[in-house]
Amino acid sequence: MAKLPDKTITSALNLQRRLLEGIDAAKAAESAIFEQSGETDATATVLDQLQNSAERLREPYSRLYTLLLRIAEAQPASSAMLDLLYRSIEQGQAALDASAASVQEAKRDWNIL
């Protein structure tokens, strides 16, 4: 593996874990709202939003996994690859923040604890 700082590796792996937790939270809220109210005109929008939130987190999760693996296999990793990793961490965090806000709003609106 190209020698990445431990802080970068830890940051990427922690973000992957939080992205996975975010996917789980979005799908759990979607399931709870569906079980509580079914799929109606009133719930259709929020169910779609929660599904989209989970989907938006899959991309950065997969990208981080792929980049870390490619960097480990590349000897040495290119600076472009490393830059892509750093940008992916930033973008993944932004996606996670946006998704968390959407999930919290849906849970609040539909009284899901």
PLM region spans:
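Short, charged/polar, low-complexity loop and linker segments
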Residues: M1-D6, E30-T45, A72-D83
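N-terminal leader/targeting helix
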Residues: M1-L20
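Amphipathic, heptad-repeat alpha-helices with coiled-coil/zipper character that mediate oligomerization
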Residues: N14-A28, D48-L69, A95-A98
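Residue-identity detector for glutamine
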Residues: Q16, Q36, Q49-Q51, Q75, ...
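Leucine-rich amphipathic alpha-helices with coiled-coil/heptad-repeat character
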Residues: I33, Y61-L64, L68-I71, Q75, ...
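Amphipathic alpha-helical binding modules
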Residues: S78-L113
